[in-house]
Regions:
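Conserved beta-sheet core of the metallophosphoesterase superfamily
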Residues: 88, 185, 190-263
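Low-complexity, serine/threonine/proline-enriched polar segments
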Residues: 49-106, 280
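Beta-strand-turn-beta hairpins that frame and shape the catalytic cleft
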Residues: 117-135, 171-172, 230-236, 265-268
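Short catalytic/ligand-binding loop motif for oxyanion handling, primarily in non-cytosolic enzymes
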Residues: 1-4, 34-38, 142-144, 182-186, ...
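Active-site glycine-centered loops adjacent to acidic/histidine catalytic or metal-binding residues
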Residues: 30-31, 178, 221-222
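Core catalytic region of metal-dependent phosphoesterases/phosphodiesterases
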Residues: 1-71
């Protein structure tokens, strides 16, 4: 749970046994993938020029490409979803491989910016007016584990998101990111739950989403809390984790969500289907 090579290998090996499921999975980066410096020592620093952060980014990007590299597309300079992720990464494969095998500050600099430039990735609608998925990186640039949970959606990434949505003006969208946009209007057990976990610029990002909120739904994880609601006109779905904080013998659950487009071309959430998982 810290973006390590063995963890990614175990995940990909498990997924390889379920090709039909793998073909439907969409991955996005979370803070444990890229921002946990040392699980055993939360105060350990990862200096801005250290190759450690860049290495975790390349592992994450490589895993994402292994799962969906031929299905998702990156945004070109005109705002159009163009090359697939695998095509976009092809010119950098040697640099990524050399860095992964040998490390070093110079090799880290050779892939600087590559991770951020791929977001948002877009799974385009399969037909005009269909449903697409915009996949965002919401992880802030942090350098030690105490601040690993901070979230931020950059202005550059937001502009690319807006351009992609404008390029497909009749389509509807799931906007998928790891961090929650704002604090939920509900009591919490500890004050610490309200510190440094939502997007730093969440209010700003929500305002930017309002212009296409009638044809989008925001989905996120991070806090693993069961919550569905709105902020302004934006519809927001928080995904409860069926494993985080659950005892092995406890009954857990997840939701299957269905969406419909009304005659007014607005995207609506239908009542979700709750799927319960029996304890072991």
């Amino acid at each position: 749970d810290a973006g390590r090579t063995g963890e990614w290998a175990e995940f990909l090996d498990a997924l390889a046994g379920h090709p039909e499921l793998a073909a439907r999975i969409i991955m996005l980066p979370g803070n444990h993938d890229v921002n946990v410096v040392d699980r055993a020592n939360p105060a350990r620093l990862d200096l801005p020029f250290s190759p450690g952060k860049r290495l975790r980014q390349m592992r994450t990007l490589s895993a994402i490409a292994a799962v969906q590299g031929d299905r998702v597309r990156v945004i070109d300079g005109s705002g159009k979803p163009s090359a697939t992720l695998n095509q976009a990464l092809e010119p950098y494969q040697d640099r990524i491989t050399q860095f992964a095998q040998h490390g070093g500050v110079r090799r880290a600099m050779a892939v600087r910016g590559l991770f951020d430039d791929q977001f948002p990735m877009v799974l385009p609608p399969d037909q005009d007016g269909g449903l697409g998925i915009a996949i965002l990186n919401s992880n802030a640039e942090t350098h030690f584990s105490f601040t690993n949970a901070l979230g931020l959606v950059s202005e550059a990434q937001t502009r690319r998101l807006e351009a992609a949505i404008r390029h497909l003006p009749t389509s509807c969208w799931i906007i998928a990111l790891h961090h929650h946009l704002m604090e939920y209007p509900m009591p919490v057990k500890t004050f610490a739950e309200r510190i440094g976990t939502a997007l730093i610029n969440g209010s700003w990002f929500v305002r930017r989403l309002q212009k296409f909120s009638d044809r989008s739904v925001v989905m996120h994880g991070h806090r693993h809390i069961d919550w569905i609601g709105t902020c302004g006109a934006s519809k927001i779905v928080s995904a409860p984790s069926p494993v985080m904080g659950a005892a092995d013998d406890a009954v857990t659950y997840f939701y299957i969500h269905r969406m419909v487009v009304g005659p007014d071309r607005k995207l609506r959430l239908a009542e979700p289907e709750r799927v319960e998982i029996a304890g072991s």
